[in-house]
């Protein structure tokens, strides 16, 4: 059962192979003071969802067609938890996280509806990951050496 608590999700991403993911998630979560994390009803529902995911390999997520629910859940919790949830379903059913993203793209009417907001947060996450790679210490030193004529 994936532990979908905020603490367990943070630990999961901290121990993930790519340390940049944890840094990006931590940065995003530092400004996510509007999420429903900590709400007792949500926390109980997330715990129950984690338990239900124990048997996820027996469920055909494609036939279940609950992408809207995943979009709404992920859109209202901290980024790390949302990404952990998507990663958990994708591990058991490869491509299921992509189906959720595609469903959001197909159903979004604006960036302010739940699907649009979900997509916007995913785009921010991906762009921050990209920027962290572009402006990594190694590349900045390489540019500095080139500007100083050492390269």
Curated annotation (Swiss-Prot):
Upper taxonomic lineage: Bacteria, Pseudomonadati, Pseudomonadota, Gammaproteobacteria, Legionellales
Q: Which GO terms describe its cellular component?
A: cytoplasm
**From its record, what is one biological process in GO terms?**
protein transport
Any phenotype upon disruption?
Deletion of the gene leads to a strong decrease in intracellular growth in human monocytes. Mutant is unable to evade phagosome lysosome fusion, but retains the pore-forming activity. Mutation severely impairs the translocation into host cells of multiple effector proteins, including SidA, SidB, SidC, SidD, SidE, SidG, SidH, WipA and WipB. Loss of this gene has an effect on the levels of IcmS.
| Annotated control of activity | Interaction with DotL is critical for the export of IcmSW-dependent substrates.
The gene name on file is icmW
UniProt superkingdom? Bacteria
Q: Which UniProt keywords apply?
A: Cytoplasm, Protein transport, Transport, Virulence
Protein's job: Component of the Dot/Icm type IVB secretion system (T4BSS), which is used to inject bacterial effector proteins into eukaryotic host cells. Part of a subcomplex which recruits effector proteins and delivers them to the core transmembrane subcomplex. The IcmS/IcmW protein complex plays an important role in protein translocation by interacting with multiple Dot/Icm effector proteins to facilitate their translocation into host cells. Interaction promotes conformational changes in the effector protein, which may facilitate display of a C-terminal translocation signal.
Q: Where in the cell is it found?
A: Cytoplasm
Q: Does the keyword Cytoplasm apply?
A: yes
Protein name listed in UniProt: Type 4 adapter protein IcmW
| Entry annotated with the keyword Nucleus | no
Q: How does it assemble?
A: The T4BSS is a complex nanomachine composed of several subcomplexes. This subunit is part of the Type IV Coupling Complex (T4CC), a subcomplex composed of the DotLMNYZ core and the IcmSW-LvgA adapter subunits, linked by the C-terminal tail of DotL. Interacts with IcmS. IcmS and IcmW form a stable complex. Interaction with IcmS greatly enhances the stability of IcmW. Interacts directly with the type 4 coupling protein DotL. Interacts with LvgA. Interacts with effector proteins.
Q: What Pfam families does the record point to?
A: IcmW (PF23130)
